[in-house]
Amino acid sequence: MKIVLAYSGGLDTTVAIRWLKETFNADVITVTVDVGQKDNFEDIEKRAYIAGATKHYTIDAKKEFADNFISYAIKMNALYEDVYPLSTALARPLIAQKVVEIAKKEKVDYIAHGSTSKGNDQVRFDLAVKALYPEAKIIAPARIWNMTREKEIEFAKARGIPIKTESSKYSIDENLWGRSIEGDDISDPSKEVPEDAFEWTKKKNNGKITLSIEFEKGIPVAINNEKMDLVKIIQVLNEVVGSYGFGRVEHLENRVVGFKSREVYEVPAALVLINSHKDLEKTVYSPLEFRFKKYIDSQWADLVYQGLWFEPLRETIQLAGDNLNKWVTGEVKIEIEGNGMRTLGRASKYSPFSEKVASYNKGWYPTDEMARGFIEIYGMHSLLTRQVRE
């Protein structure tokens, strides 16, 4: 029997290697997907083999993550419950996709992951595997063994598996698009998040910084007139604006699995790019397009958060988003100060803004007759309804 395991290199999945090997008498093939996390992948590979893996794959998927997942999160202004840019949720279907590719390559129909029965990730991972490889059988050791962190450490020590036993106050999930922070010290939503929980947004620079972000068809292509690919743009923004203390998100999140959870994220680049993109959309869209886009944006974000990346509706909504983003070309100038961002200006060749029409000092004015006629017809629904109810 062979099992392909999505392997992060952390305690849970390291213990899972040996547990799967012993429980199922299986050969375990581990797959680590690089989606921009700041890990030492050579160390992760060594750890996998020490724990008992028979084969290990490290897959660099940063560009694919940016081009095929993050790009759509930007175009769809993806903020779950108006605040969370879906950093973890976006990465899960890609990781599952890469694990499935290895499983098919190795002719293995057992796939394992380290998600618990309490988290959203189990839903995202299981549904992605079911969509891409319906014949596969999914094993989630953490849903079966019910081991605490202490028991996992004991399990590893008893088998000679080297584990860093110093307790960390926080559980971190990191990728190109963001850093999520969990732990007992921040689980109480009535208490302030301790400063030591943050890494990307530790304030190193005081004052403010001004940046210009250039977009082509909804995709960011340059910072301060310097062209870069999307991976580089995200990396630069995370480092630069994060150093001013910008990019922190804290909210009480409605999880897929049925309860509320206090969630904390560091997402500097995501917030800069999504908010700049939203501003440029408002610049170029008609009012009807703008209202419609706001609606489908929220639907897209909900589907992705809920683990439904392979839901046909997500693809349909995305097609509409692509069509609307054809006009989202231009530049947005922003200012970052602390955890605040404001727009200084924006410009696009597709903006229907007309100074001649909008200016109060010169140009076009409707006549009194035109204004009266417009107001009469515009307010008719409201006035007639009010009259019959009085």
UniProtKB/Swiss-Prot annotation:
PROSITE patterns reported in the protein's UniProt record: ARGININOSUCCIN_SYN_1, ARGININOSUCCIN_SYN_2
Keyword NAD: no
Pathway info: Amino-acid biosynthesis; L-arginine biosynthesis; L-arginine from L-ornithine and carbamoyl phosphate: step 2/3
Annotated L-aspartate binding sites: 116, 120-121
List of residues binding L-citrulline: 84, 120, 124, 171, 180, 253, 265
GO annotations of cellular component type: cytoplasm
GO BP term (any one): argininosuccinate metabolic process
Organism superkingdom: Archaea
GO-annotated molecular function: argininosuccinate synthase activity; ATP binding
Residues holding ATP: 6-14, 114
Pfam families per the UniProt record, alphabetical: Arginosuc_syn_C (PF20979), Arginosuc_synth (PF00764)
Matching Gene3D superfamilies: Argininosuccinate synthetase, chain A, domain 2 (3.90.1260.10), HUPs (3.40.50.620)
Keywords for this protein: Amino-acid biosynthesis, Arginine biosynthesis, ATP-binding, Cytoplasm, Ligase, Nucleotide-binding
TM ranges: none
CDD domains linked to this entry: ASS (cd01999)
Enzyme class name: ligase
Family label: Belongs to the argininosuccinate synthase family. Type 1 subfamily.
NCBIfam families: argG, PRK00509.1
Database matches in PANTHER family: ARGININOSUCCINATE SYNTHASE
Protein name, as recorded: Argininosuccinate synthase
